[in-house]
Amino acid sequence: MGVGSKIRELIDYYYSKKNEKNIVPINIPKNQSNLLKNKVALIVDGTGGIGVAISESFMEAGAKVIISGTSEEKVTKTVEKLGNAARGIQIDLNNVTEFNNKVSQAISLFPENRIDILVNCAGVHGDQKFGIVSEATYDAVMNTNLKGLFFMTQIVSNYMKEKKIKGHILNVSSAAALKPGYTPYEISKSGVRSFTLGAAAELIPYGIVVNAIAPGPVATAMLGRKEGDTLYTDCIPAKRFATPSEIGQLAVIMVSDMCDLVIGDTFYISGGSGTIQY
């Protein structure tokens, strides 16, 4: 064997040994019905149509859920509807100073004393368009949709880092974030999309995966839809509204091990709204 060949052999051996510690075992994907088994999820503002659907889908996948909402009465009713795998806590997203205490309380609601998954589900529209937007409307939308989301994510991710929990954070954005933003709602949801990218880059070194889902029109009370109404609509290419359960099923996958390599992405479930049609 020549000197050159021997040197190459030694170099190859050195790097093979050096990289042994970085070997990642291949894990076979789990049965979807158990994707979130033994996980505890905090669903922020989980008393609305999408929040309840996400909670139901999470429980079907094996998770326990903690529902938060501004109205204690709504939280109580939602938890009663969801059953034994659910707990509730009142959190006002306009009162950031309470977040640390509220998150600590939420952690203690189940014997596991932990939070593995955070879903930021809050969203308010505001009914004023550019040119007539009041400061009060602007602040109300931004405080709920963006400011509250930012600080809740900061607090829960700090907890995950401290406890070395390789968790998942899922932000609920909107297909409206892809449109030219001239309302507080569109601007706030565009901010959520941007923050999702930044938080993902900041937290992935700790094994915390951050992504977002962006619904288009969904058949919920926010859009004046109720059970029994038609899903048909002319306003998007798919010609129908999404159902809350479709959002919930996608959310399950997004916070499961199946999406550990999806980092900082926003999944659009919009029927083409915002992606191929503005």
Indicate where each model-derived feature is located:
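Short C-terminal tail/terminal secondary-structure segment
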Residues: I26-I28, I263-Y278
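Substrate-binding pocket helix/loop in short-chain dehydrogenase/reductase
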Residues: K129-F130, S134-M142, Y232
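Alpha-helical segment proximal to the catalytic Tyr-Lys
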Residues: N158, A201-P205, D260
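Residue(s) in the substrate-gating loop at a strand-loop-helix junction
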Residues: S174
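Non-catalytic terminal and boundary segments that flank Rossmann-like NAD(P)-dependent oxidoreductase
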Residues: M1-N38
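Active-site helix of classical SDR
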Residues: T153, S188, T196
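Conserved glycine-rich cofactor-binding loop
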Residues: T47-G48, S71
